[in-house]
Amino acid sequence: MKKVLSLLLLPMLFLSAAACAGGSGKNDNSTVTDGKVPTVSTVTTDKGDTTVQITGSAADTVQNDDAPTTPIGNIGVGVTCGDTSKFTDETIEILKKNNIQCVRVVFLYPFRDASGKTVSDSFSKARAAAIKLASAGFTVVGQTFWPGGMGADSSGQRTWLLHTGIPEAYARYDEDLTYDKMAEATRYIARSLKKYVEYWLVSNEPDIETYTGPMTDAQILRYINSCAKGIKEGNPNAKCGINLLGLVNPARSKLFVSRLYGNDSCLDWLGLDGYFGSLQAGGAETWDDYITQFHAIAKKPIIITEWSYPSPETDPLNTFPHQWEGHVRGKKAQADFVSACMKIFIKHEEVIGTLWYQLCDSDAVCWECGNPDCRLYSDWGILCEDLTGKPAMQAMAEASVAFQKARKKQ
């Protein structure tokens, strides 16, 4: 989410259209020499570890790579949930009952270490959750790992953290090997979920410092292209996009869009994030012009990848410095925000889906500052922590029906 990065207008490092279509990129020094992931089988030990047995070339395991790609379509109204343990049968029933069609699932770096021979526990759990959701009829939007995060270390000092599982050996963004390994990892993720996940969100809010830290613009753009390239090699039918917190530094965010989207782009849709009336100035109405501006540049379908409004009536640490004019923060205002925003999203035919942040409240300590009383990541839920409903969930259920009716008329 949410920090401002100074404007760095550095040259773009483009990948070719052939690379996006599944060909080899420049300086491909990956240990997977044929550009594909080896044949993989998994063995789970009595300790719960999942070991990957690599026995051959993926040339023997590719399925339906020559099948025609499906057109991008409406994914509907959905939610994000970073805690895969929440995807229980009870949760799935709640989502279905409230007309939720899509769910965003986060995938950290898939391997336990730099060898790339052992799948991480977090990846195994996320993969199982995605399969469960897809099998239940939801469209799963998979999100790949991002470079890291500017957060609090054990002493409370703000520093660059490799908290998405990327090995330190592959976090050197001035080296070609790093980008080869990022493509290799996303290729594996996409291939292993090929039957279940078609829509992929690449990285996370690359236009702000929080998730890119010391990287230059050229490195950030190369990272995105490398990851998208890997996804499309793993699943040529994949639909890739990025999410931008576009009104923090609009000039910089628009520069990213202009350089990442175009005729040779690996990206198929653009995601927009916003926290208006709480972390950012404005309100539900701010979305209208925001969508128009960025769609005009990208010329791609839009997914509202993060939108939310906190429900607590009190804010002792002033975590949410902005107010939605004419509204008193609380559960009713949260529900009103859902209804007001969804009317705007429905009006914009270029919007093919929405992902509310997030499914339920949490008491997790803020990773950015380390203060146990900070609610930056805690109070956005459309459900309470115990999965009981809020008025916002009913508002979302009603808006979801309206969204689907409007899109069927297009």
Regions found by a protein language model. Give the residues of each.
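Short, acidic/polar
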Residues: 83-95, 182-189, 250-260, 338-344
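Short, low-complexity, disordered segments immediately C-terminal to signal peptides
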Residues: 21-47
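Glycoside hydrolase catalytic-domain groove-lining segments
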Residues: 260-321, 342-346, 351
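Active-site beta-loop-alpha junctions enriched in small/polar residues
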Residues: 80-84, 108, 145-147, 205, ...
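C-terminal motif of bacterial Sec signal peptides marking the signal peptidase cleavage site
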Residues: 16-19
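Aromatic-rich peripheral "rim/lid" segments of glycoside hydrolase catalytic domains that contact
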Residues: 314, 319-320, 355-410
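Active-site cleft segment of glycoside hydrolase catalytic domains centered on the general acid/base Glu
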Residues: 116, 122-123, 155-267, 278-289, ...
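N-terminal substrate-binding region of glycoside hydrolase catalytic domains
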Residues: 67-181, 201
